[in-house]
Amino acid sequence: MKEFHKINLLNDYYGSLLTERQQNFIELYYGEDLSLGEIAEQYNVTRQAVHDTLKRAEQTLTNYEEKLGLVSKFSQESKSLVEVINLLDGYESGEAPEGLEKSKGILKKILEKRQDL
């Protein structure tokens, strides 16, 4: 996963847990594609201060993911749902008659995992 995409995804899940300043810097840098210098000028701080704040925010987001794993769970669930769609497509076309039963099994596993949360 590219770093840019990874941080945006982590921010979607855990961004509200960051400080307001970290949230603002992440949004400006990753969301609005401003440079460190542009953010520094806007907040009347040094580029180094912006860089340090971004790195701390990125590390905090990564730590949340390591502990909670919500992005990982979402990604795995998405892959499973794509597999279900493919199996059902095969079932409908007659190419994979076992697709319906396999799909049910995958969906049951997803539900079981959600109930464990």
Curated annotation (Swiss-Prot):
InterPro entries: RNA_pol_sigma_r3/r4-like, UPF0122, UPF0122_fam_protein, WH-like_DNA-bd_sf. It comes from Desulforamulus reducens (strain ATCC BAA-1160 / DSM 100696 / MI-1). Disulfide bonds: none annotated. PANTHER family: UPF0122 PROTEIN CBO2450/CLC_2298, UPF0122 PROTEIN YLXM. This is UPF0122 protein Dred_2057. Belongs to the UPF0122 family. Might take part in the signal recognition particle (SRP) pathway. This is inferred from the conservation of its genetic proximity to ftsY/ffh. May be a regulatory protein. HAMAP family: UPF0122.
